[in-house]
Every structure is written in structure tokens, then in C-alpha cells.
Amino acid sequence: MANDSPAKSLVDIDLSSLRDPAGIFELVEVVGNGTYGQVYKGRHVKTVTAAIKVMDVTEDEEEEITLEINMLKKYSHHRNIATYYGAFIKKSPPGHDDQLWLVMEFCGAGSITDLVKNTKGNTLKEDWIAYISREILRGLAHLHIHHVIHRDIKGQNVLLTENAEVKLVDFGVSAQLDRTVGRRNTFIGTPYWMAPEVIACDENPDATYDYRSDLWSCGITAIEMAEGGPPLCDMHPMRALFLIPRNPPPRLKSKKWSKKFFSFIEGCLVKNYMQRPSTEQLLKHPFIRDQPNERQVRIQLKDHIDRTRKKRGEKDETEYEYSGSEEEEEEVPEQEGEPSSIVNVPGESTLRRDFLRLQQENKERSEALRRQQLLQEQQLREQEEYKRQLLAERQKRIEQQKEQRRRLEEQQRREREARRQQEREQRRREQEEKRRLEELERRRKEEEERRRAEEEKRRVEREQEYIRRQLEEEQRHLEILQQQLLQEQAMLLHDHRRPHAQQQPPPPQQQDRSKPSFHAPEPKPHYDPADRAREVQWSHLASLKNNVSPVSRSHSFSDPSPKFAHHHLRSQDPCPPSRSEGLSQSSDSKSEVPEPTQKAWSRSDSDEVPPRVPVRTTSRSPVLSRRDSPLQGGGQQNSQAGQRNSTSSIEPRLLWERVEKLVPRPGSGSSSGSSNSGSQPGSHPGSQSGSGERFRVRSSSKSEGSPSPRQESAAKKPDDKKEVFRSLKPAGEVDLTALAKELRAVEDVRPPHKVTDYSSSSEESGTTDEEEEDVEQEGADDSTSGPEDTRAASSPNLSNGETESVKTMIVHDDVESEPAMTPSKEGTLIVRQTQSASSTLQKHKSSSSFTPFIDPRLLQISPSSGTTVTSVVGFSCDGLRPEAIRQDPTRKGSVVNVNPTNTRPQSDTPEIRKYKKRFNSEILCAALWGVNLLVGTESGLMLLDRSGQGKVYPLISRRRFQQMDVLEGLNVLVTISGKKDKLRVYYLSWLRNKILHNDPEVEKKQGWTTVGDLEGCVHYKVVKYERIKFLVIALKSSVEVYAWAPKPYHKFMAFKSFGELLHKPLLVDLTVEEGQRLKVIYGSCAGFHAVDVDSGSVYDIYLPTHIQCSIKPHAIIILPNTDGMELLVCYEDEGVYVNTYGRITKDVVLQWGEMPTSVAYIRSNQTMGWGEKAIEIRSVETGHLDGVFMHKRAQRLKFLCGRNDKVFFSSVRSGGSSQVYFMTLGRTSLLSW
């Protein structure tokens, strides 16, 4: 290369004497940015391509630009430095700076940074790195010999020619050393490659450095070629400037490199520059010196350059970056270039000589140019005047165009506003239309309900009318039957006297009572015929009195006295029991004699009265309940007609059994038992099972109604005495047996549930803690409840017949269950759970673990009788136990519905479900991924498929997952995982492929990466502010702040670090005050503290001094609508309202009912606390209690995650197994809280 260029001092360079480049060079396109100007790809009109740096010459920069030209002119004549060809001045109109064109050698293969980016794995081979590093050191040795520091060595300032030659460029920050001092103290360069002594110049004005700072940058560039980027490149540049002087020297991360390479890096990166080897010493290093295959390396580099250009070729020629110190540009695509060859391009030396000759001619002609300029000044002034006019007109046109654009933009803005207004109006109309349709639908449903109610009322009236007619017909029949029986009685007495007048009656002690006779009932010896006639007459009259009193049945069903019926009879007649009474008693006691006995017809006064069966306090059946009112009315009419009332009704009971058969009752066998009505004054609160009650009612009806068919058959054959006696019982027995069969057939076809059915099953539905084992049911994981969530029963605690409308709180488990609700004495709603089969009431195991105590506002209680329940649930510190709030044992587990006509949609009701899957180890965290749930345990990561059958897919095993969050928009899962509690980021596409196995390319890639080198992470929080996603991390004794960097980085990069904190952080969050100031809020065992991100100052927000020992912080809740200034901090069993400066904002302390294990902020401005005895829901604004879910036994629960109205939490049972609970908070309920 030419070395004959005379060295000139700075004063010898006269910028005004440079020629205009017009006709010599022309610009083609921009290829990069330098420190003082843009770099163009240019073309010499007669020879080849050149690099042209175009700079505006201002008075402030004239000295620096002159210095750069001087450096290039003197020291660019080296094979490893881009050659300086010449400089030109392009004149500009008055008022504008002239342009300096700096023409240099064009390196067509781009920079080392481009080479690394275009290489697989973003790493170069070790022999390539050795070759490039040697060429860099040779160029630096040339500069250092001449006492010049480059000061900006980095990958982008090391270029390659098409022949794989290495050239140093960009002398924009180079400086010549003062020959006496030998050191510089100017702070300039690129941060990541900057030497520690250069950075120290900014902090200490007395600090100095020398040419060995370039050797540090050379070592960093070698690491860049080996690892794809310089150390600390994932940090903010100002953060890197802070860490480089303080961190130990960087080293190669991978172990694959040779010892010579490690040694070379170690030699370059010595922090004390006085001990750093010189350039000549590094050139003699074995890594640089021993390169036996240099020619082969150059061939490989050239072939790689050609392959990359062909692979990415989109244009005709290649363009590369010429980058400055402060700006890093994106990768520029490469294009087709000239054919590659090891031989130098012909004409290169001729071009250099031509530029030197042109430069010399410029100097000789400078004087002539000055004279010519003086002559042309007049012309220039005229031209300037003309140009000024043109510029004024042009400026005017530009202003007009701007005004037109402004008006057009204003018009477009108004049109957009009009469109938005129209869209808002359209949406408003659509919403009004939707509300109107919903109102119409609601009215239609109300109208249908009203019509159904009216139809039901009409049907009931028709049934009552039918029953009334039946009763009247039966009454008429009974009157006829009474007359026939009186006639028959007279005939029988007449016929009976004649045989007795002829026979001698035997003694009563020898009479065999065990042999019944239907032909001749033998009289007692001391009775005269008149007495016997009275006995028969009284027996018949007693049965008739019973038959004609239908209204007395209601009293017999509800009177608590078991001796009422017998007392009623004896008050009428002191005589022994009649024949019909005897028959009734023997039937009641379920006598198994196949034929009716004669004893009741011929018993003496000395006979012992058989034991009476006490009248059972039987509960009213559904049919009888519905027909109670009309019957009482009918009973009043009959009593006005002169009939006696009696409590032992026979024929009416048979009639009611017939009515029950004729009118099918829509009640279930399992739940349609009866309990005593609270309106009956003497009703007993105890109750029996429903099936048993109906059985007793039927058996009573059989026994007590049996005389009626016997009397009917007797009336048909009054002339035949023997047939009369023979037909009395068998006919009734056959009739009642058939009637019982029909009733049982009707019961079997009843629908399963009806809101008018009653059940009081204290014996069957009692639950204990021992019975709370989970009953697994296939497919019950995502089961939904049926539309009927309530059943009907009476409540002794509702006075004056008042009823309340409640919304049932559903607690789902592994089996479908039916909740029931009773208002307690304190006014608090207690939800319990009962189960019923479709036909029989069975003893079951309760699988519910929760007893909700809900604020009446939550359940939307609307009492039907005009009363309002206003009591709010209270909660004591020691917790309420379910046993303490139950009713008396006879009411335990009752099914209660206090608003039978109101059925609410399922979406309004809060639910708790438990997934069937049992995890072998404790669940530590979870996150929703779409609709499915990622579950992290002590032993791995799994996916719970909530969209299907609840299947669990294992994803990662033998790794502990402590915390996780899904960021679907970024395709990452952020976790704290592993034995060392590292912050790992998993790619969702990789996890998805582990389930689907449909992308082989994804399987080959690494599925996760770590955030920095952080270990021992305690807690983190992802905070989204506008479009920035911050990741604030609590370590054992420090807090780190990272920020997400989009493509091409696509990772979290370090933003701030706060180490050696006085209090070890346990909980961390980040707030943005008024959209301007970032503050880290963290909780420790001493209280809550804040860190100002900008200044790094740490101060206390709240220290609970009333607690002597250490505390456990639960949650930091940034209150909405406070510009990030106000907080609710929860610890132990309390919560305090403070602002970010430590001032108490509310004189309110949120007090949990017990010590919670987890506290979480949920939607609708509420917070939930999970304790061992209950789950509490409280308002985040006031701390008031909104609802409580009591546990039936103490258990440890942990909040996992939530979205909208869904909350997930887990339970840990003995042995370490866990299950996931899924809680849906009803939308309407939440909005009304």
C-alpha cells in the first residue's frame, strides 16, 4: 500500500480549499451512521465503489472533523485500517452548513457483528476468532506506535472486505496521545465494550488511561464473537456502566473453548490497565501467534460470506452498517456482490493514487480558486437574491401545504369523532334494544308464571269441587245406609230373641273366645234382650257417628293427645266398646287372625279391654295438605246439617285414600315426607322419615276405614242374616288390599321433586366429621347443578308464617348434592347439604366441607311477607363451629325452601367444586392457561384439562415449582422453580408441544431459560404499566427489577437492583405513582417498606409496633382509583390502609376472623382470606365482611390463582396429598355486594 503521503499537521488542512465532489463521486445509498455523520455507499464515476461519510460542517464540530481527517490522512495507510481516499466540500445555499464528503475504502462484506448474527448459534469458530483478533491487534499496533487511541473498538467497527480482510473503521472518537503525558482523561466510547479506566474518567476527573484501553475492548469483542454479544448486553447501558468497574473481569461462559483462548481473554481483561499486557505482547500470545491454517480460515470466511449473501439476497448489491458509538442499528440484509476471490481486486492501488493526485491538485489550485471566488461574488449575490426569492415562494407553498394538511387532518379528525359518536350511539341503541328485549322476555316469563299459577289454582279448585261432590255423595249414601242398618237391626233383634227364649245360655267363664262364629253370637247371661239391643244399637250408632264427620280428620292428624279418640267415644257412652270399635282396634294393632273374630260382638263387662294403639302424631301428606282448606269448609256445612264431629273417622279416611289414588301426587318418595305445620297450635317439632309416614297413614286408613265396605255389603242383602255377618270383613279386606296396591303404583310413577313436598329426616341426614369421606364420581369434575336447587319445608323459627326468599349457595363435591338452607335464630343463613335418591330416602355420607354464612345482600333475600332481613354476618375471633349454630337434633339437615315459586338461574349462585384428581404432593402454585390450569407441586408441573374430563397431563417432573404466572401474549410461563429457586421462563409453545407432539422443530429447541443468574428467589410480581411489563423479584436480601425487552431480544433484561436491604423481603410489588414515579413495595417480617426506583432510597411504610414478635406479611394491594398512591397491606390477621409515603389514610383496621393462611385480591373490589375454619370475603375499600364459608372441620387451604369470577385454591390433607377447589362467585351476586 502507498505510504508516501506526506504527514501534515492540523493547520495544514484547509477545509475551504477542498474541491466539490460533483462529477467525481455520487452517492448511492445509506449504509450506516458514524459519530458525526451518515455513511453512504458511493461510486467513483471512473473507477469503483467507495464509502463516503457525509458530515455537516459547523463551527462547533469543525475542530473534531478536522482532527478525524488528519488521523485518517496520516494513519490509514495500513492493511488493517480502512484507507482514506480524500475529502470534498459540497457547497450549500447561504444559511445552510456546507457538507464534507469523506471518501474511504468500501468494505463489502460488512461488520463482525453482522457475521456473528448470520452464523448458526450466533458464535464463530475458535480459529476464525483467532484470525480476526490477530488482524485487530495488528491494526491497533499500528495506531499505538503512532500514539493514537482508537477508543471505540467493537464488532460494528471491525469490517470485512470481500477477500476476508479485516479493517478498522470509525476514527470519529480517536485521539492522539499527548507526547508528554501519554494518557487521556476523556470519557467517550460504547458502554458494553468500554474499559473500567475509561468509565472511571466520568466519575473521577483526575483519572487517566492510555492505549491499553483498546486491548480491553479487543477482549470484549472476542467474547462477542464467541457468545453472540458482549457481557452485560441484556442490561440497560447505564446499568452496565455502573457494573463494569465493580464486577470482576468477565470470562467465557462455555467450557468448550481451548485453554489458549481462555488465557487470551484473561490477558486482555485485566482491570488494572497498568498491569494489562501491551499490544506487542498480545500479538506474541500463543492464541494469536499459532495459526497454521490462516489461508484455510480466510477461504472459509469468504465462502461463508458468499453463502450468507446468496441466502439472504434480496437486492443487487450488499449493504452493511457503518455504525457510530452511541447507536446500534438493526441487522441490515446482505445482497449479491462481486465474485469472491483471494486475489486483491484489480485497480485498488490505481484508485488510491488517483485520489492522492487529485488531493495534490486541489492544493495547487487553491489560490486560483480564491481569485475566482472573488470575481464570482457579485454573481453569487445575485444568485443568492434569486434563490432567496425562490426559497420564500417555496416556503410559502410549504406553509400552504401544511395548512391544507392541517385542515384535512382536522376534517378527518371530525369525521372520526362523528363515526365514534355514531358507533357509541349505535351501541347505546343496541344496548337499549337488548334491555328492552330482556324486559319483554322477563315480562313474558312473569306472565307465563302468572298463567301457570292461575291454571294451578283452577285445577286445585276443580279438585276441591270434585272432592266436595264426592263427600256429598258419600254423605247421602251414608244416610241411606244408616236407615237400612236401623231396619236390619230391628229384624235381627226380633229373630235373635226367639232362639234365646228356647236355649239355656252357658256360663261366661266356660265360653271359648278363641273360636269365632258368624252365625250365632252368644249373649251374656246377665244381659236382658233390651240391654243387648241397646249394645248393638250403640255399636252401630258409634260407627255411624264416625262416618258422618269428615271435618274431624284434621284434628285427628294433628292433635297431640293419643287418647283423644277414646275419650270422645266414652264421653258419649259409658258402655264397653262397641263391635265396630273392637274391629277397628284389632285392625290397628295389626292382628294376624285370618278370619274376623266374634269376641268384639259378645264381650261382657268383666272382659279386659284390649290394649289401644296410641294415636300417632302423623304428619300431613302432600295431598292432604293441599286439600285442608276446602275440607274444613265442607266440614262446617256438614256440622250445620246436624252431624256430630268425631276424631275417629272411618269412611272419610277411606275416601281420602281413594282421593290420593285418583289424584296423583307429584312428590318424590325420598323427599315428600311430612313435617308438622308450624301453624298448628299443638304440632310437635319432631318428625319421622317421609316413607314411613306415608306407610303409617295408609295402614291407619286400612284399619279404620274397613267397616264402611262391610256395611255397604250388608245393606245390599238385608234379608239374609248369615250373609250379612259373613260379608262384613272379607269384602272390606279385599277392597283395601286392592286400594293399597293402586296407591303403591301411583307412588312409583311420581316425579322426583316438587317444591310443595316436605321432608324432615333427622334420622337419615345426620352428618358427622367421620362421615366426611369423599365419594368419587366419574365425570363430576366439571358437573353443574340442576335447575332445582331448593326443596320445601316448614320452619319453626319463622314466626307468623313468614317466609324468606333466598338464593341457595351451592357447594359441589365429587358427587351431585343438594344444598338446603334454614334461617338460624340469629338471622344468619346457614347452608347445609342433603342428598336424596329418586324413590327412597337413604342414609348418606355428606361430602361437603363448607358451610357458607352469607351476607343477606349477597343472597338477595326478599321476604315474601313484607319483612326485611337486615342483620349482617358477624364473625368472632375464635371462629364459629357448625355444632354451635345447628338447630335441635330433630331439625339437622332439613331441606328448606322459603320461596317455593321463585327459581333463580344457576349463574347467579356462588359455587364451590372440588376436582376429583388427588395430587400426591402438595400444590404450591397454579396459573390459568386459557381455560386449563397449570398446577405446580413439590414434584413437578402438570396441566389440568378443565375443558374435557379433568385429565391431568404431566409436563415437567422432579422439579419443585413455587410460583408461576402465564403471559400468553409473550409466549412465556414465568416461574420460581428448582432446588435453587431460580427464576425460570418456560416457552408456552414448548409446553404445548409436550402435550400435542405436533411440531418436531420445537422439540429440538431448549424449552426454558433463566432470568439473569438469579438464585434464591423468594417472591416475584409481574406488573404491567402501559406497554411495559416489569418483573420485580424478591431475593434473600435484595430486590431486582427487570423489564421485558421485545424482539430481537425477547427476554427480561435487568433494569435496577437494590442489594443489601436491612429487612429481608418476603413479599414484593411495584407501583407507579401518578404515572411517573416507580416505587418498589416489599413486606418483611418487620413490616412493609418502599424503595424509590430513581434514587434508590429505602424507607418504612408501616411497622406494626403493637406486635412484639416477627409478622407474616400476606398481601400488598394497590387500591384502585388512587393513582398508585394508596395501599392495603395485610399481615397476620389484620390489614391497614396507608399511602406510599407511610401515612395512614383510613382510621380503619381490616380484621380477619382468624389467622389466614392466604390473602388474595379478587375482582369486584374485594379481598378473600383463607383460614383453617372459614373463608372470608371482605370489601377492599372498607374491610366490611361480605360473606363467610365455614369449614366443617379445620383444614389448611392455599390460594392459587383467579380470573374474573373464578377463584382456585387447594387443600392439603394428611399424607401430603392435595386437591384443587374451584370457586365461582355468581356474577349478579358479586355486582350486588
UniProtKB/Swiss-Prot annotation:
Modified residues (Phosphoserine): 5, 323, 325, 543, 619, 621, 629, 646, 691, 703, 706, 785, 794-795, 799, 817, 846, 849, 894, 907
Start and end residues of each stretch annotated as Disordered: 305-348, 401-463, 489-805
Keywords from the named record: Acetylation, ATP-binding, Cytoplasm, Kinase, Nucleotide-binding, Phosphoprotein, Serine/threonine-protein kinase, Transferase
Low complexity: compositionally biased ranges: 666-692
Domain of life: Eukaryota
Pfam families in the cross-refs: CNH, Pkinase
Cell compartments where the protein resides: Cytoplasm
Binding site for ATP: V31, G32, N33, G34, T35, Y36, G37, Q38, V39, K53
PROSITE patterns reported for this sequence: CNH (PS50219), PROTEIN_KINASE_ATP (PS00107), PROTEIN_KINASE_DOM (PS50011), PROTEIN_KINASE_ST (PS00108)
Reactions listed under catalytic activity: L-seryl-[protein] + ATP = O-phospho-L-seryl-[protein] + ADP + H(+); L-threonyl-[protein] + ATP = O-phospho-L-threonyl-[protein] + ADP + H(+)
Location of the active site: D152 (proton acceptor)
Enzyme Commission number, as recorded: 2.7.11.1
Region listing for Mediates interaction with RAP2A, in residue ranges: 852-1206
Enzyme class at the top of the EC tree: transferase
GO molecular function, one term: ATP binding
GO BP of this protein: positive regulation of ARF protein signal transduction; positive regulation of focal adhesion assembly; positive regulation of focal adhesion disassembly; positive regulation of JNK cascade; positive regulation of keratinocyte migration; protein phosphorylation; regulation of JNK cascade
Modification type Phosphothreonine: residues: T822
Family statement drawn from the similarity comment of this UniProt entry: Belongs to the protein kinase superfamily. STE Ser/Thr protein kinase family. STE20 subfamily.
Subunit structure: Interacts with the SH3 domain of the adapter proteins Nck. Interacts (via its CNH regulatory domain) with ATL1 (via the N-terminal region). Interacts with RAP2A (GTP-bound form preferentially).
UniProt xrefs under PANTHER family: MISSHAPEN LIKE KINASE 1
Function (record text): Serine/threonine kinase that plays a role in the response to environmental stress and cytokines such as TNF-alpha. Appears to act upstream of the JUN N-terminal pathway. Activator of the Hippo signaling pathway which plays a pivotal role in organ size control and tumor suppression by restricting proliferation and promoting apoptosis. MAP4Ks act in parallel to and are partially redundant with STK3/MST2 and STK4/MST2 in the phosphorylation and activation of LATS1/2, and establish MAP4Ks as components of the expanded Hippo pathway.
Protein known as: Mitogen-activated protein kinase kinase kinase kinase 4
Annotated source species: Mus musculus (Mouse)
